[in-house]
Amino acid sequence: MAGVAHMGGVSPAVDCGPGGWLVCDFRKLGNFEAYAPYDNVSELTARVNDEGWDVTIINWLKVSRFNSKDCVFVFSVGGGNLEKNISANIVKVVQEAKRIGAKVVGVVAKDGGYTKEVGDAVLVVPTLSSERITPHTEGFQAVIWHLLISHPKLQVNPTKWESTK
């Protein structure tokens, strides 16, 4: 699961998992307000213990005033599937985003799951090898977020090595 971001009329970016790097890049290179809810382990464990895993992200977002100006960026291999009980927390965040009118974008694989089914803009990484779906997907996700944040319309601050001449 990745993030929610305030991007000019689009609100905060939130991230979990490998998307933490995306949140860092959005903040550092693009000056976007972006968050990684699972970076606060104390709050995460308190929420899991008291509320359950499936609602950890959505309840965290509610405290962050999640609204229709926000965009949820999902990085997931399967995109969430309630029937198979896989990444139900992602499904719940996507459901809430759609309910309040926030945008849902993502990079997923396989059939894309619930994220692909209802998302506003979702890329599906093609399966090159059924034995390497997860590493290929996560590798492509990193390429895609780096291409996104380095786009001239989004990147306002230079990367380190490019800034040294």
Regions found by a protein language model. Give the residues of each.
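Glycine-rich, small/polar surface segments that engage phosphate groups of diverse ligands
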Residues: M1-N67, C71
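Residue-identity detector for glycine
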Residues: G3, G8-G9, G17-G20, G30, ...
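Generic structural signal for well-ordered, non-membrane alpha-helical segments
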Residues: D15-G19, D50, D54, I86, ...
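Short alpha-helices
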Residues: C16, R99, V108-K165
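A generic structural signal for short coil/turn motifs at secondary-structure boundaries
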Residues: T45-A46, N81-K84, R132-P135
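C-terminal binding/interaction regions
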Residues: V63, S68-V125
